[in-house]
Amino acid sequence: MNAPHVLIDLLGACWEVDAAVVEVAWDTWGQCAGFALGDGTLALANGLWKGGPRLKPREDGGVEFVQAQAPPAPLAYVRVHEGTCLALAADPEGGLLSGGDDGRLVHLRLDGASELVAHEVDAWIDRVAASPSGGRSYACGRRVHWLGPKPACLMISGSATSMAFDPGGTRLAISHNGGVTLWAADTLRERELVWPGYHRNVAWSPDGRYLVTGMEENALHGWRVADAADIEMAGYPGQPRSLSFSADGSFLATSGGMRAVCWRFDPPRADDTPHESGIAGKTPVSRVACHPVHPLVAVGYHGGEVMLCQPGSSDILLVKGAGNGAVSAMAWSPDVRRLALGTGAGNLAIVFLPDELFRFGRRKQTGFPDGG
């Protein structure tokens, strides 16, 4: 790797706010990145930077950086909760869905107009999930609500810790103490996947065949959904609180260590050992986000660094240096050319990372990004 500068300094738009970033999500069309803040505000960052930095092809090959000709647009702020934003998701019909500790589920349009979707008295709405096919759901404690033409409510065995729709949007996975509950959209019937322990987050493989949770017991647990066969993945020094599958489903990247930990999933095998990726920072990994197309992982650290790496490789591209709090949220844009990130100290950024920045060989997962 030959990267003379930190990429955020060359290709990034940065802002600072007076509250921690809880979550970040892009709207369905990638026009805007919404940052849910700890003070109940949504900060909207325009993802279309007119006169922003760009890459210019060189006559002799490679690319060169062209500096921005205009500053990025300022953030737009919308107060959506009386307390804290707790959950955020892109709404399939446009805009964003936000849940908060005031018991409100709010739909926010990109023009700043908001609509109250649901209100739970004396309860927190701390989990929100949506699918491109139109599914919308939220949870408050043990109650999970399915929104739509035929709304329904499901009482699960423990408080919901995470929710995710499968790739087809037909099943909702809800993690909790003791395992995962699957809720089918067509029949509204539930199915239990049981494993002892506290399951804090959940992720589907892109083909919907596997489901994985990160556990408080410093381990992962997975299931082959068809027959509920168990997949055990242990040995973490810390809790794997962030999970992300590669676009082709060949590997799962997680936090929980000093480097990103990647497990093979093509398919998973009982004797497989994970591959650590990137380099060890001075602090543990806090967030991971796989690139939507390429075999790359964006890795955020508690110390504030953000790097790009490939599974099993120690080569990295440095996106952001240390400082400004732990990386608390990351999300790739729908057009896969921008990475939005936020920290616990209120540092927000959108970094332009187009395909021209990377160089891959013909074989799968070969070659590494060329810093120019």
Q: How does the language model describe each region?
A:
Residues 1-372:
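WD40-repeat beta-propeller superdomains and closely related acidic/aromatic-rich repeat-like regions
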